[in-house]
Every structure is written in structure tokens, then in C-alpha cells.
């Protein structure tokens, strides 16, 4: 597909007539079977931010003041978020857990009836709730495992979560020591008091 260039903008934001004529000529070569109106539409489709006269086109209907109808002021265009190929380290553990969880769900669905294993498809009776109509049916309870603690977890995943949560530094933080009293009066005050 042939490409066309944008009309050159002069210092004031408009297009210079010579550059616009050259652009229309190039556009007419690229799209020789289109009418002038169609060529302008193609140019607008290729470059939706600039109208055929060089002014900014928003695509929204405008009022007589030039601002789009329904908005008090025009906002500058926002930059699309960039795609990061290297996610932050604290997200890696969560992504790994999601991957393992989806793999585990696939395995559990494929082998529901192994002897000696409690499997995720147990029918738990939660009892009748208020109103009776909202009680959980056995088929709805069978869709998800009821006990989270019965899922096997990889040691590598656990260690990555420990690092992610900062629990590996528990020895460095005295306020996290278990059994430590908040106030140690014998060390804070002299024995003569």
C-alpha cells in the first residue's frame, strides 16, 4: 500500500500552499482513481490528528466556539502507555503464580477422580442461607475448589513471594520479631528508679 506524507506545517500551524499542492499531487498519484473528496477522506483516515486544512481534527462535533460539544475545554492528547518487555521484579512472582494456578486448574479438571487425593470437585454443603433461594447448589460449589490450603505450591514460588513481600528481611526488622515485647522497661530505665 503506498504511503503518503503529512502536509508540512508552517510556524503558525497551517500548511504552506506549495507543500499542500505537492501533497495533493502525490496523493493523486497514489490514489488516482479517487475523487478529490475521497482523497481528502483518505488523508484524514491516514492522519486523524490533522484535518485537510492543517488544523487539528478531534473527530467530535464542534460548537461555534471550536471546542467539542459536551466538553467544557479541549484536553491535550494523551500518550498511549508504553509496552514494557521487562516487567518489574515484584510482578514476576504474581505472574508465575497465575501461570501455575492455571496449569493446576487444568490438571485438576483432567484428573478429578484419583484415589487418595481429595480433588477440587468436592460437594461441600454450606447449609441454607437466609431466604433459601440463594443457597449454593452442588454444581455451583463444584466449579471452584473450596479449600485454598490444599493446593500444592512450588518452593520456588513461595520463595519469590517471600522476597516480593519483604519477609526475607524479617531478621533485619526488630518490630517483626515474634514474642518481642513492645516496651522493654528493664533496658530503657535504669535500675535505680
From Swiss-Prot:
Changing residue 16 to A: Strongly reduces phosphorylation but does not interfere with its NES-dependent nuclear export. The lineage of its organism: Eukaryota, Metazoa, Chordata, Craniata, Vertebrata. Phosphorylated. Phosphorylation changes in a cell cycle-dependent manner and reduces its transcriptional coactivator activity. A motif (Nuclear export signal) lies at residues 158-167. It comes from Homo sapiens (Human). Pfam families: CITED. Changing residue 178 to A: Does not change subcellular localization. It comes from the Eukaryota. This is Cbp/p300-interacting transactivator 1.
Amino acid at each position: 500500500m503506498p504511503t503518503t506524507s503529512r502536509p508540512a506545517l508552517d510556524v503558525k500551524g497551517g500548511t504552506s500552499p506549495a507543500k499542500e499542492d505537492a501533497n495533493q499531487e502525490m496523493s493523486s498519484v497514489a490514489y488516482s482513481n479517487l475523487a478529490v473528496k475521497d482523497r481528502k477522506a483518505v488523508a484524514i483516515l491516514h492522519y486523524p490528528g490533522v484535518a485537510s486544512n492543517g488544523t487539528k481534527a478531534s473527530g467530535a462535533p464542534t460548537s461555534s466556539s471550536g471546542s467539542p460539544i459536551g466538553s467544557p475545554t479541549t484536553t491535550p492528547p494523551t500518550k498511549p502507555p508504553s509496552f514494557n518487555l521487562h516487567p518489574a521484579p515484584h510482578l514476576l512472582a504474581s505472574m508465575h503464580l497465575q501461570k501455575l494456578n492455571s496449569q493446576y486448574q487444568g490438571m485438576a479438571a483432567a484428573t478429578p477422580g484419583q484415589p487418595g487425593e481429595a480433588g477440587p470437585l468436592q460437594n461441600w454443603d454450606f447449609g441454607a442461607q437466609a431466604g433459601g433461594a440463594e443457597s449454593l447448589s452442588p454444581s455451583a460449589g463444584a466449579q471452584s475448589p473450596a479449600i485454598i490450603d490444599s493446593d500444592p505450591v512450588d518452593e520456588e514460588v513461595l520463595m519469590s513471594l517471600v522476597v516480593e513481600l519483604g519477609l526475607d528481611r524479617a531478621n533485619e526488622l526488630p518490630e517483626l520479631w515474634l514474642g518481642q515485647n513492645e516496651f522493654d522497661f528493664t533496658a530503657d530505665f535504669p535500675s535505680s528508679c
